[in-house]
Regions:
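Residue-level preference for beta-strand/loop junctions
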Residues: 5-7, 53, 68, 101
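Hydrophobic-ligand binding "helix-grip"
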Residues: 34, 63-117, 154
C-alpha cells in the first residue's frame, strides 16, 4: 500500500480467479455496486458493458456528506480487456459536458499462477481544494480500498 501522505492509495490483492472473470465484473456497470464494501455505489443508470476508452457510464450514488443521492458520470480512460480498466468520475454540466471531479479509479490485472493480482489505484491528486474542504477528500481511508478488493473477490465467485 502507498504511504498515507501521497494523494493516492494503491493496493494489490491476489484473487483466485482468471483475469477474464474479474474483468467481466469491472466492465459491467450494473455490477459495480458489488465491488465496494458499503452502500455508497448504487444501481447503474447505464447498464451496457464497458467496451473502450471514451465511453461514459452513469451510476447512482449515495453519500450523506455529499448531500445524499447523486449521479456520478464516469469517463473510461483506460481499457485493455482482461488487463486494465480505469475511469474518471465527474458530473455533467448544463450543456452535457463531463466535468471531472479530480479523482480516478484504475484496476490493473496480472495473471499469477491460478489467480490474478488485482491492483486498485484511487488517486485524488487533481481534486479542487474547495471540494476537498467541503466533502473531505479522501472520503475514506486506505482500508476502504482493501475492503473493495475483498468485495470484488466475492463478486467474482
Amino acid at each position: 500500500m502507498t504511504a498515507p501522505t501521497e494523494e493516492r492509495y494503491v493496493v494489490t490483492r491476489t484473487i483466485p480467479a482468471p483475469p477474464a472473470k474479474i474483468f467481466a465484473v469491472l466492465a459491467d456497470p450494473a455490477r459495480h455496486k458489488h465491488t465496494e464494501p458499503g452502500d455508497w455505489v448504487r444501481d447503474a443508470e447505464d447498464t451496457d458493458p464497458i467496451t473502450g476508452t471514451g465511453q461514459m457510464f452513469a451510476v447512482n450514488m449515495f453519500l450523506d456528506r455529499a448531500g445524499g443521492h447523486y449521479v456520478m458520470h464516469n469517463v473510461v480512460t483506460a481499457f485493455e480487456p482482461d488487463r486494465t480498466i480505469a475511469w474518471l468520475p465527474g458530473q455533467l454540466d448544463e450543456s452535457g459536458k463531463h466535468s471531472p471531479g479530480g479523482w480516478w479509479w484504475r484496476y490493473d490485472l496480472t495473471p499469477n499462477g491460478t489467480g490474478t493480482d488485482v491492483t486498485l489505484t484511487y488517486d485524488w491528486s487533481e481534486t479542487d481544494q474547495g471540494f476537498r474542504d467541503a466533502v473531505g477528500v479522501p472520503v475514506f481511508g486506505p482500508e476502504f480500498i482493501e475492503e473493495s478488493l475483498a468485495a470484488l473477490e466475492r463478486a467474482v465467485r
